[in-house]
């Protein structure tokens, strides 16, 4: 029997919950991406297939990647560990070092899956101040009642540490 390990969520969203448009970020804030890179560097990242396909391959050189996909065989030639279900995911993370940080990085379907099943211990959410159009959302209602701590703020965004109470 193993203890269920929870992930740390890390994503950016507008106040309306927009996280992507056409499998890409609708904004360009290099400092915010640097924060993502430095926070997740050297750790395990979890994502859905669309997020995986949108990321540059170089990101996987310093991170272990677990990718949810309905058809993992299609992606086997690429770097990463591919899973079809939460059960397969639990098996994989049970084999990781107990001190290994695990970050759930999106997209929308995976974020909602992890939040619905309470698989997130805390969430680093960058709130983008400007409105953008998009086609992928993060339902920010999931964070109602979570404690917010401001990590950084500037004119373009605020980085929050959200803790589930």
Q: What is each residue range found by the language model?
A:
Residues 2-165:
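Enzymes that bind and transform nitrogen-containing heteroaromatic metabolites
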């Amino acid at each position: 029997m193993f203890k269920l390990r929870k992930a740390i969520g890390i994503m950016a969203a507008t106040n309306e919950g927009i996280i992507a448009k056409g499998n890409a970020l609708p904004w360009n804030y290099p400092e915010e991406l640097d924060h993502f890179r430095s926070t997740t560097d050297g750790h395990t990242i979890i994502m859905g297939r669309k997020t995986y396909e949108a990321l540059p391959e170089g990101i996987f050189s310093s991170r272990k990647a677990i990718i949810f996909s309905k058809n993992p065989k299609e992606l086997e030639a690429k770097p990463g560990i591919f899973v079809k279900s939460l059960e397969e995911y639990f098996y994989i993370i049970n084999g990781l070092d107990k001190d290994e940080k695990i970050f759930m990085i999106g997209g929308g379907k995976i974020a909602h899956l992890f939040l619905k099943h309470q698989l997130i211990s805390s969430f680093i959410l960058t709130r983008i101040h400007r409105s953008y159009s998009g086609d992928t959302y993060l339902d920010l209602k999931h964070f109602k009642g979570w404690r917010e701590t401001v990590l950084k703020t500037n004119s373009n965004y605020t980085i929050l540490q959200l803790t589930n109470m």
